[in-house]
């Protein structure tokens, strides 16, 4: 498959803070395809209450909508999980979803997480043979100093950054500079 694969989208309508309805989801699909995306993985937020009952039906319809746009436009299903002590067990039991039935897990943390806690969570997931994809890596201030980013990568995780974090004037904005440096140095994988 050539083209962009977007592994972090809130495109299923009515599930969480993303798309409100199918019209909005279609517009999101069309815009993504026009920008070169050829595969989108829908990643609604994980809830300890379990999977939304309609999640698989919505994912199937999303696939149909993408196919109407172009035959080479594919979709998948996963979740943006929030790390908690029971996450690994929930993944094993199918109560939380990996990215399109792979070993990759899109996981986010509290922005104020300590590096020690973040590292321990990554180790717990990798020891269970999952590959954590840390969502919104730009939000974790504990990674701004030292070698934490490199250490996490060496541990086996992948890093995802929001495109919007690269926008703006990098000359004056320290956050934008940090984000751009991570991309330039090859530390951002998705």
Residue ranges and their predicted role:
Residues 9, 45-46, 80-81, 137, ...:
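Active-site metal-binding loops of divalent metal-dependent hydrolases
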Residues 22-29, 87-92, 116-118, 178-179:
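Short, acidic/polar
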């Amino acid at each position: 498959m050539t083209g962009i694969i977007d592994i972090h989208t809130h495109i299923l309508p009515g599930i969480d803070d993303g798309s409100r309805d199918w019209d909005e989801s279609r517009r999101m699909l069309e815009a993504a395809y026009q920008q070169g995306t050829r595969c989108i993985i829908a990643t609604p937020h994980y809830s300890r209450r379990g999977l939304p009952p309609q999640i698989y039906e919505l994912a199937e319809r999303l696939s149909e909508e993408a196919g109407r746009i172009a035959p080479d436009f594919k979709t998948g299903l996963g979740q943006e999980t929030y790390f908690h002590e029971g996450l690994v067990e929930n993944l094993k039991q199918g109560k939380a979803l990996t990215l399109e039935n792979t070993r990759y897990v899109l996981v986010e943390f509290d922005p104020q997480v300590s590096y020690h806690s973040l590292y321990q969570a990554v180790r717990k997931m990798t020891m269970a043979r999952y590959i954590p994809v840390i969502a919104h890596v730009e939000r974790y201030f504990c990674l701004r100093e030292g070698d934490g980013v490199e250490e996490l990568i060496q541990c086996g995780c992948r890093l995802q950054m929001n495109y919007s974090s690269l926008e703006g004037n990098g000359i004056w904005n320290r956050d934008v500079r940090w984000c751009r440096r991570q991309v330039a140095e090859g530390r951002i994988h998705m």
